[in-house]
A protein has these predicted regions:
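Conserved phosphate-binding elements of NTP-dependent enzyme cores
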Residues: 1-988
Length: 988
């Protein structure tokens, strides 16, 4: 991708000028942002980066664009308030690309989200070839060119008739193509009348036809007595033309065939005149129906909607395009596949009521030679299917027959309860999870159906489309379509998503993956002159892939777009054309523009906190000593999920353990889909064996906490104070004041969630929603309480000259000072300061928090626990949204949890956190099918010395160049996919 020269001097080029920005904590700042350049906004958490980038510039750019639309169009778009700013000039229409995955649509996939699937549907509709589901022959209709070529290839001079069958009455209705494949229906006997024959002949004369043909004889209309010899109870043909084979008759032949198709309901017949009177005439039949010429099955001609699982025309009728159905779940029916049939592998038949069925099953198995004393998973596919499907001739209905019988009995309550234990989402048996009807799956390009193409990863799809071998005509038709598909695949590859399959549900993607898909889609749209506002695009990216992301950003810039990137990644900051550093602190102590200029200028600026870290003046040091494994481990044997197959791993407890690896290497699969789910299933009595073969050491874990980035609440009522239970203490403080006692107020009167003291006009929301019918709903400040949420009588109660509403508007830092005499309140709030959230307001809506803020708020809640002993905490990229300075606080919080007896397991790419871990498990070596294995384990120093580890290569640079060496630890590389013994590791 070509690199344009950096455009970094605002005075030399067009720019966005902002004067007097006061959104949230911004301190009336003025700044400029150069057009057609990459501008990075940096600063500690809460310094005002998102307020500047999203709530000011994006909001105004989007608002102005929406205001330019008609009132009708505006009703379908989100209403955006004008930001609190004096003036913004030079702004372009804005596009926000956030790290949040808000997709919950079970039909949305990577292919549909990137528009690749739209082009695939078009490609298969235009050049796809349909193959018969019955006999495998290609399904086609006879075109005029193909017929002419086939006929003219015969020896010259042969004479023949061009005919079509005379239909004296309508045929039965043709088979419904949507139910294909169906054999052609037999013609019903026709009962003729003289009037019907006369009307048909008159109609033929009017249309210019003068001859009929039957059994080798030609009958002229000019001699009506000849027609008396025609037997109209047998097939009669209209003679369209008489020809002799030669190259000169090509055009005339095609015209005649076209007439037959039009008049003969899509069918044409060529009958060759025999050389001898006793010879049987040779006949060739052609038709324009889209059917299999071998077995007669009729199909629907491919068109884009046939390949859409969102359209009833193309969706599988059984699952309606979802790919799964609610059916009996085999994993619940046979939860422990290590059991044999004799030991009760089929769980429902171990119940007293149905034990007789187990006896019949074992009897059937013996007659079929199926071993009953072998583990179910060791049976062959044929043997398993025999047990499941049964054999009615042998008197055994099978497991499926058993559940079908129960379905007929589910009018009984106890049967419905019994069935519910074994129900679940199962792959649709009709489409095998492909979502499309059989006719769509019968269409192929280069031997692959559209569902087979979508099952490919981006990495597999690129060479497939690059190497497509097409005919000259197909290549001309598909040229532009293939160009769009290849371009989108290339961009997905360049943003580090080559391991994703095209049919991967977008609801299962991480926030970082979702953002990079949006980034790739934006680049493929080749939009110019737009303002792109990005929220930490490096999240979820391994350091190896960061350079590819930077090239994507430069590509967007080189198209003529302006990029405003909120970012903490040092490589991305150093690649920027222009840098703005906000601070100096968070919340009320932030919101000031500390520095604005080029990256080189920032490295020399003494006031920029980011610059001080980048030039090495400040750094996150390697801990002086690492904790050693104390002999307690969670051991997983035979882990299997997604790209992990048969993996053995030991995770030491009581340490900070980092799971690392390139994108798609299996980190989340190992930690969440295997470890977390298996531990939860073991604790709740579920089937943990569906995640691994053996699980040991979990008795050392008292609880498992997944601290993710999901919101703390779905309504504006949730806030930091209520989440940490600090608001309970604050309400008690207000209820204990003399004024509250005088009025008879209890702590409940100071709650906005229950009736009593809250404003009933807005029910404690502070806002009311007005339905505008034909316009978007408008949310207005409540006129009764003016947004305070409380009745005036409650607001009259003061503590230290502040009412409850004013307290909720305080930041955590302000509240700590305000409630200093109340240790119960400060004890709960102080943990927010420890995790770097002192800038949050107590009453700030939980829906406004970023994913990283929500995760750290949950971490703070866990830090308030009295007893963390034996708890395993799992974090997925906890550094999301964190500045270098905030990472120090996060690591301190982790150490506090571990000092309290907990274990901390993190999935992380940030090298500063990785080098601070006590133990590492590095996955890889690549993503997708080339991942799912353990590349290296041990201390960061050990992994850094492993030549097979991509993480190790970058970690070695971080340990040596930025942090004063590797502490002299020597180690040997550990073999992949082995269970290491942490006790033998050298740790200083």
């Amino acid at each position: 991708m070509p690199n344009a020269p950096a455009k970094v001097i605002p005075g030399d080029i067009e720019e966005i000028r902002v004067r007097g920005a006061r959104v949230h904590n911004l301190k009336n700042i003025d700044f400029v942002i150069p057009h057609s350049a990459i501008t990075v906004v940096s600063g500690v958490s809460g310094s005002g980066k998102s307020s500047l980038a999203f709530d000011t510039l994006y909001a105004e750019g989007q608002r102005r664009y929406i205001e330019s639309l008609s009132a009708y169009a505006r009703q379908f778009l989100e209403r955006i308030e004008k930001p609190d700013v004096d003036e913004i000039t030079g702004i372009a229409p804005a596009i926000a690309i956030r790290q949040k995955n808000s997709t919950r649509n079970p039909r949305s996939t990577v292919a549909t989200a990137t528009e690749i699937y739209d082009y695939l549907r078009l490609l298969f509709a235009r050049i796809g070839r349909t193959f018969c589901l019955r006999c495998g022959e290609e399904v086609r209709k006879d075109t005029l060119d193909e017929i002419a070529a086939k006929v003219l290839a015969l020896p010259e001079g042969r004479r023949f008739y061009v005919l079509y069958e005379l239909k004296l009455s309508p045929d039965p209705a043709p088979a419904d193509a949507t139910n294909a494949p169906n054999a052609p229906r037999a013609r019903k006997p026709i009962r003729l009348t003289q009037d019907a024959v006369r009307e048909s002949l008159i109609s033929l004369r009017k249309r210019g036809f003068n001859r009929l043909y039957q059994s080798g004889r030609v009958f002229e209309f000019a001699t009506p007595e000849d027609l008396l010899d025609v037997n109209f109870t047998k097939p009669v043909y209209v003679l369209v033309d008489r020809l002799a084979l030669s190259p000169e008759v090509r055009s005339r032949l095609m015209d005649s065939i076209e007439i037959c198709y039009r008049e003969g309901r899509g069918e044409a017949i060529l009958e060759f005149v025999p050389d001898a009177p006793d010879e049987k005439p040779e006949r060739m039949v052609f038709n324009e129906r889209f059917e299999c010429k071998k077995c007669g099955s009729i199909y629907q001609e491919p068109e884009p909607r046939l390949f859409s699982f969102n359209n009833p025309y193309g969706a599988c009728p059984r699952c309606q395009g979802f790919g799964n159905t609610i059916d009996f779940d085999l994993d619940r029916v046979i939860p422990d596949k290590s059991k044999s049939l004799a030991d009760g592998a089929i769980e429902p038949w171990t119940k007293p009521r149905y034990r007789q069925l187990a006896i019949e099953m074992r009897k059937f198995a013996r007659t079929k030679g199926i071993p009953v004393d072998v583990a179910y998973r060791d049976l062959t596919i044929t043997q398993r299917n025999a047990i499941l499907d049964g054999d009615k001739k042998e008197g055994y209905e099978g497991v499926k027959g058993f559940f079908n019988w129960l379905e007929r009995k589910k009018y009984k309550l106890h049967v419905r309860v019994f069935l519910s234990r074994y129900r679940g989402y199962a792959t649709c048996p009709d489409c095998n999870g492909t979502r499309l009807r059989p006719e769509a799956r019968a269409v192929k390009v280069a031997g692959r159906s559209i569902t087979a193409v979508c099952q490919m990863t981006v990495k597999e799809a690129r060479p497939f489309f690059d190497g497509l071998k097409l005919t000259e005509l197909e290549a001309a038709i598909a040229e532009k379509i293939l160009e769009e598909i290849q371009q989108r695949l290339r961009f997905l590859d360049e943003v580090g998503l080559d391991y994703l399959s095209l049919d991967r549900l977008t609801s299962t993607l991480s926030g970082g993956e979702t953002q990079r898909i949006q980034l790739a889609t934006s680049l493929s749209s080749r939009l110019v002159g737009a303002l792109y506002v990005l929220d930490e695009p490096s999240i979820g990216l391994h350091p190896r892939d960061t350079n590819r992301l930077i090239e994507i950003l430069k590509g967007l810039r080189d198209l003529g777009n302006t990029l405003l990137v909120v970012e903490h990644d040092p490589d991305t900051i150093m690649a920027a054309d222009y840098v703005m550093d906000l601070g100096p602190g968070a919340g009320e102590h932030g919101g000031k523009l500390i520095f604005a200029g080029t990256r080189d200028q920032m490295l020399k600026d003494p006031h920029s906190l980011t610059g001080r870290y980048l030039r090495g003046e400040l750094k996150i040091l390697v801990p002086p000593r690492r904790r050693k494994p104390q002999g307690k481990f969670v051991k997983i044997f035979g882990a299997h999920s997604h790209n992990i197959k048969g993996l053995d791993v030991m995770i030491p407890l009581g340490l900070l353990v980092a799971v690392t690896g390139v994108s798609g290497s299996g980190k989340s699969t190992l930690v969440y889909d295997v470890l977390y789910k298996a531990l939860q299933a073991r604790r709740t009595g579920g089937n943990w064996r569906e995640f691994c073969d053996r699980l040991e050491g979990d008795n050392s874990i008292s609880a498992v906490e997944m601290v993710d980035q999901t919101p703390i609440g779905r309504t504006p009522r949730s806030n930091p104070a209520t989440y940490l239970k600090a608001f309970d203490c604050i309400r008690e403080v207000f209820a204990s004041t003399p004024e509250a006692k005088k009025r008879g107020f209890t702590p409940g009167h100071f709650s906005f969630n229950i009736p009593g003291g809250r404003c009933e006009a807005c029910q404690g929301d502070g806002t009311v929603t007005v339905e505008m019918r034909f316009l978007a709903d408008v949310e207005l400040v409540c006129e009764e309480c003016r947004g305070t949420r409380y009745k005036s009588s409650v607001l009259d109660v003061h503590y230290k000259e502040k009412n409850i509403h004013e307290v909720l508007q305080m930041t955590v830092r302000e509240a700590l000072s305000f409630f200093a005499p109340n240790p119960k309140v400060t004890a709960k709030l102080r943990v927010l300061e420890e995790v770097g959230l002192s800038y949050l307001r107590l009453g700030q809506s939980g829906t406004t928090l970023s994913g990283g803020e929500a995760q750290r708020l949950k971490l703070a809640a866990h830090l308030t626990r009295q007893d963390n002993n034996g708890i395993l905490y799992i974090f997925d990229e906890p550094t999301t949204g964190l500045h270098f300075d905030d990472i120090q606080k996060l690591l301190t919080a982790f150490r506090k949890l571990i000092d309290g007896g907990a274990s901390v397991l993190i999935i992380e790419h940030n090298l500063d956190v990785i080098k601070s871990a006590d133990w590492m498990i590095d996955m890889g070596p690549e993503g997708g099918d080339e991942g799912g294995r353990i590349v290296a384990v041990g201390t960061p120093e050990q992994v850094a010395r492993n030549s097979q580890s991509h993480t190790g290569k970058f970690l070695a640079k971080s340990l040596n160049s930025r942090n004063g060496g590797n502490h002299g630890v020597s180690s040997v590389p550990l073999k992949a996919n082995s269970v290491p013994n942490p006790d033998t590791s050298t740790v200083e």
